[in-house]
Amino acid sequence: MLFPEAFQNLPAPAGPELFEVDRLLKGSGLLRLSRGGLNLWAVERQPAFLFMKKGGIDFYIKGGISFFNCRHLLMENIRPCGDGYEMEYEGTGQYYQPFGEYQGTNDWWEMDHSRRRTSGHLSVKVKATVTPVDDGFDIRVQTWGCPASTIRFEFGILPNVLIRGEGYRIPANAGGSLVATKGELELFDGKDTVSVGPGFAVNDVIKGLFGVGGPVQPLFQRRDKF
């Protein structure tokens, strides 16, 4: 260094809790945010559409849906909205009514399905909103459309993190899973903490739901379903 005295009065580098990033790469369908030491990446058209990291805590959020032939919540059109960003998904389909009379054959493939009445166009929409706050992000999900659709959000968490919730504390082991039926939970790696919730669920299915995609074995899965 030729002139060390020129750097003597510079302020100390900001810690990760003060480091802020806010960048939308619209052409690539990517969003990069950082607040309070928590980093977030949003990706369009991927089942795992949110990735987050704070210190040694790494996890993703993946969306699945049971709606006709739709199984993945593939978010699209990440865009600015108020103080944050939003993205959306729309699934469509139609239900074929029974024939109502014998078709002259028991072979499903030989039947004239153009004669069947349908329910008409049905759709379900999901909108996720990400708003930066002082110590992280406020993430909210809205759904509307076909009322009987079942939607799941899965949190995949790297091992060696302790999961603390109402009435339980368990390690995030590879291949493990739980359904958080109520309340908040914390992800704790011995140094940093990430709070998630509230969670809720209306069924007891833990694995093999919807065919959203095979679980990533090195990760622990936490699922919310509604």
Where are these regions (language model features)?
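Extended polysaccharide-engagement surfaces of secreted carbohydrate-active enzymes
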Residues: 1-190
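Beta-strand-rich recognition/accessory modules
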Residues: 179-226
